[in-house]
Amino acid sequence: MRCRTLARELRRRGAEIGFVCRQQPGDLIEMLRQEFQVLSLPPLAAAASSSSLEGRALYGAWLGFSQQQDAEDCLSALAKAGISSAQWLVVDHYGLDASWERAMREGLGSEPPPQLLVIDDLADRSHICDLLLDQNFFGAATQQRYGGLVPAQCRQLLGPQYALLGPEYALLHPLVPPRTELRRVLVFFGGVDHDNFTGRTLEALLNPKFAHLAVDVVLGLQSPHFQSVASLVAQRPNTTLHGPQPSLAVLIARADLAIGAGGATTWERACLGLPSLVVAIAANQLPFAQCLDQAGHLQLLGVAGEISVTQLRQAFAEALQVASVGSGHCLTDGWGTSRLASALLGLDHPIRLRLVAPGDEALLLRWANDPAVRASSFSTQPIQSEDHHSWFEAGLSNPERLQLVPLDQSNCPIGQIRFDRIDGLASIDI
């Protein structure tokens, strides 16, 4: 889904987009074909059981073939479609690494060769990419995880400020007010929710002490638990069951608390400042969910197999009594897709300027603490949020300071320009 979000923005900027997908149960090929050209690879001969596998072995089983065979299938599909060159190859698969990437580049054989964007969050294998995106949060380690895994010249876009969200999130980010009272809960554990955490959550919310809470439940029609969840929804007043949604933005914006999984929806909730209770339902969700919990950006309840209805009920009771569940609102402003599109295609439109606004505080702090910025600053130590807040607040009312934010064609902030005048001397910071 994140690749579709990126593809939409690239197409809006004039790029020609194609997807290469292997046929398998539950694939999204027909959905993608409604918008894009899709080249489908031959299906797996038989789905091997992967229940006992983990780590690299598990991700290799997801691929279903050797990386060399998969690359040959991709190249064959491209050749049959008459595609012999590309400006960028975008790969988003845990089972692929530098060997597949090398085979694809060499197999296309175009001059110049295609550049390569890798989307990853595992940091457990080598890549030969020109651009790497990892939109997840790992605390102080966020900027260091890919050392030695990518070429020295690879540009790394790391952290939630690059989260691939739909354009509605950037528009709503400055408009949604902070939550001050718990009145409405959003329940979403993914479209399928194999472990039926949606049902468990509703069982917890059937307790009379939560009767005043309105509840929005989102679940895909293909979920094996849809009917049982619908039955629970019918037992609870002021509770609505929603089927598949083109975007969760409206439901997130009107909720006061969310409970859900720790996947990509984490950044949608954070962008709109929604305090969240999180259950890690997949192994790759746990590391960054733990980091977010430790930093106070959400409350991690635990991993899927460890959470009971009683624990869920207790978590809701605590959320009612103490408004201490983090939201992560400062982590992302919703412009990640635009930032990545600009990194891929460049800035080919005039840049506009606007005055800095109160809502820019978190963004300016992220920029100031970027490793490249700190390395070229008078002090290489990260700026603390409390110190930055005092400096930022003073600057907003300082008549001797002019601070501007350049915007790209999508109105995405791409930098800052500051003019200061002190005792007849002027300084410029870019």
Residue ranges and their predicted role:
Residues 13-72, 302:
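Conserved nucleotide-sugar phosphate-binding/catalytic loop shared by glycosyltransferases and other
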Residues 127-196, 222-227:
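A nucleotide-sugar donor-handling region in carbohydrate enzymes
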Residues 173, 179-255:
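Donor-nucleotide binding loops and adjacent catalytic segments primarily
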Residues 253-264:
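Acidic donor-binding loop of glycosyltransferase active sites
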Residues 266-311:
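Catalytic binding pocket for nucleotide-activated donors in carbohydrate/polymer assembly enzymes
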Residues 321-345:
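A charged, aromatic-enriched C-terminal amphipathic alpha-helix characteristic of glycosyltransferases
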Residues 345-359:
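Conserved N-terminal entry element of GNAT/NAT acetyltransferase domains
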Residues 381-429:
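Acetyl-CoA-dependent GNAT
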